[in-house]
Amino acid sequence: MAQALPGLDRSGAWEIPTRLNMAAQCLSHDPARLAIIDLTGDARRDVSFGTLSDMVDRLARALAQRVRAGGRVGVLLGQSPWCAAAHLAIWKIGAISVPLFKLFKYDALASRVRDAGVTLVLTDPEGRDLLGGLATPLMGDSVGM
């Protein structure tokens, strides 16, 4: 007898839920378990799922006051735990995250922001300067990052 595969029902079809929140699924691990190894600073920083979940909740509360489900939110941050938390927080409130890259020039940012319908961008001072009025910047330090 063949062994059942995770995610498949008895007939071999995928078990697809009617609703799925990617953020909740991603964060549904032991809070003490390692989620992210941050090597961007002077020293290694380990971020647990519990800490990441707290970061996500803080950002989600701030974003929920500004963005509706289905809204497009740009993320223009460096590669850090806060960048990961930003995407998860956006998904948690049912919005769509649009990854943006600080090495893009203005025209590349403009095409992505406009094509995706981004109106708000979670960023920092460097990112705000790169945006140049393309969308409303939401400064990370104003939401506890």
Describe the function of each predicted region.
Residues 35-88, 105-110, 114:
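Conserved AMP-binding/adenylate-forming core of the ANL superfamily
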Residues 65, 88, 92-145:
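Structural core segment of the AMP-binding/adenylate-forming
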Residues 1-3, 38, 86, 137-140:
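Generic low-polarity alpha-helical segments
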